[in-house]
Amino acid sequence: MGGNAHRRKGVDKMFRYVHTNIIAKDASRLIAFYKSVLHCESINETRDLSGKWLDGLTGLNGAHITGEHLLLPGYGKDHPTLEIFSYDTLKEAVPAEVNRCGIAHIAFEVDDVEGTLAEIIEAGGSSVGEVVTTLYPNDLEAVFVYAKDPEGNILELQSWRTRKKASSCNL
């Protein structure tokens, strides 16, 4: 267990967000995508798992999982991670949509939304919608786009900046 666990005042229970899991058709390819395009880093936590304990955990007979944990950009070595795994036997997924119930997307803050979207597309991903810009309180401007990784998982790219105020000149 990492050193940044949270304990609520008066409650003797530990809580800490640890990872998000993606089940991939081709874990090696998807791991390479997240490393090269979205700057996730290997922390040398590869997995090749099987056994009765895994069968019990998953409810699957003969389960076999391979994959890797990747450190998400912007975090120290003490997690959270993106866990990309593949099972020997996969069940086909319903295509992801932004308004589907359940976990909908993984969001990344980037410097250049349009440039990162171009990298995603070049690496086999796709765009879901269009790049949009909107204003938030406190003079914040946000740029957003939804995209899909090469296996169809939805990503949100976002960039935030302080809006430039127009100068007022009195002539």
Predicted regions and their residues:
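Short, P/G- and charge-enriched loop/turn segments at secondary-structure junctions
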Residues: 8, 54-59, 92-96
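Active-site beta-strand termini and strand-to-loop segments that position acidic
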Residues: 70-75, 147-150, 160
